[in-house]
């Protein structure tokens, strides 16, 4: 697959158990991300950096998106519009309401977050999450629990892919908000 995609701009659509709205996932902020991401109907862009090993996203010119909650009709609808937006942003089709393929719109108000570390999930029977993805958690604030035992933030952070049941061995990721798309 990697050989077949060499030199291509690649778009991968997934769904998640952590967040209902679409967001983009990239390896690093490159020219493809800067050109395409502002045209996608996403809430945020996640820069994964060191957390890409073995994933398609570690290859150049690859954008991934999470379309919404797994199995939801909204995620399926979002996937359709994400695919259309990607095709319009890359000049393959006209954007809805645009006169030609060059008029794909765009915005700069999309927040960019960089993953810093994993949030491990201790062995437990029941997990809870109290924080919301992409919303700042303050130092000392309870953000999750394992068998009723609270997990408190050591320092401020933004949770990303935070879910009680998304990953077997981790709640999600600690991230920093590093700015907006430029």
Can you name each region flagged by the protein language model?
Residues 1-182:
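Structured catalytic-domain cores with a bias toward divalent-metal coordination
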């Amino acid at each position: 697959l990697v050989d077949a995609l060499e030199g291509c701009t690649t778009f991968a659509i997934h769904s998640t158990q952590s967040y209902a709205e679409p967001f983009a996932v990239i390896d690093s902020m490159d020219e493809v991300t800067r050109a395409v991401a502002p045209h996608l109907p996403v809430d945020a862009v996640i820069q994964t950096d060191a957390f890409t090993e073995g994933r398609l996203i570690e290859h150049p010119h690859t954008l991934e998106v999470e379309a919404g909650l797994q199995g939801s009709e909204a995620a399926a609808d979002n996937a359709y519009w994400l695919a259309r937006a990607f095709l319009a942003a890359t000049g393959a089709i006209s954007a809805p309401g645009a006169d030609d393929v060059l008029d794909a719109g765009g915005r700069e108000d999309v927040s960019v977050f960089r993953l810093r570390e994993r949030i491990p999930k201790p062995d437990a029977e029941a997990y809870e999450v109290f924080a919301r993805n992409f919303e700042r958690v303050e130092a000392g604030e309870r953000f999750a629990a394992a068998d009723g035992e609270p997990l408190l933030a050591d320092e401020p952070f933004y949770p990303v892919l935070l879910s009680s049941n998304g990953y077997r061995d981790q709640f999600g990721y600690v991230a920093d908000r590093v700015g907006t798309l430029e």
